[in-house]
Amino acid sequence: MFFKGEGKNSRLYAIIALIVVIIIVFTFLFSNQLTKAYIPDKVLSFWTEDIEERSGSDTLFGLEKWASFTYRNNNETYPAYVTVTSIKALFMPSEADLLDKTIEALDKAKEDGIILDESSILRGKRKNNFNHESMFVIYTGNDTSKDPVEKIKIIGETWNCVVSGSSVICIGFAQITDNLHGNSEPNLIHWEKIVGSKTGFLGFISDNGLIYNVKCH
């Protein structure tokens, strides 16, 4: 009789443990909602979101999620864009790991003819308009897909948002020459819009810098 009672207790404990696990999983799933980072309309000016570039996905049964928005300046002579990607993973990566992933993504741009000048690399940290400390990497390079080749500048900037529990990766790209029409002097007006901040990041003072104002919570 003793052993029979012990067997019943074991089964009861197993059922209770299973119920607890199910509750924990469902609690995590419902709390694992992705807060999608975006650029507020009030700072976009003549920039607009490219709806066709909007993307996102769930992986690992919804335990990892991501969403991405792309904004363009709608200028054919000096094209520029900013992509804002939000990631909610089972475990939040470090900022250093995020930056490494971003550098890998920038390096893959060579498949589209974007050749980065490795000697031009600039790394650092700054605080955005919502007081998140970000890490960034900046390159100058060439867009060899254009004829003639055009000069470009590109930034990858990342941070973790503790409030929303998500990670944010921003990539900003700007063509700064117009060799097609004989304008080889750098035109940084769209680059300034991408990287500008109240504190004068890279010498560009602006309340409406796009990456500086990305809202993630």
Model-based region annotation:
Residues 40, 103-106, 207-211:
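Extracytoplasmic/secreted envelope proteins and their assembly/folding machinery
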Residues 47, 169-217:
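Surface-exposed amphipathic alpha-helical segments
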Residues 1-12, 165-169, 209, 215:
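Solvent-exposed, well-ordered amphipathic alpha-helical segments
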Residues 53-167, 176-179:
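Conserved polar/disulfide-associated segments of primarily extracytoplasmic proteins
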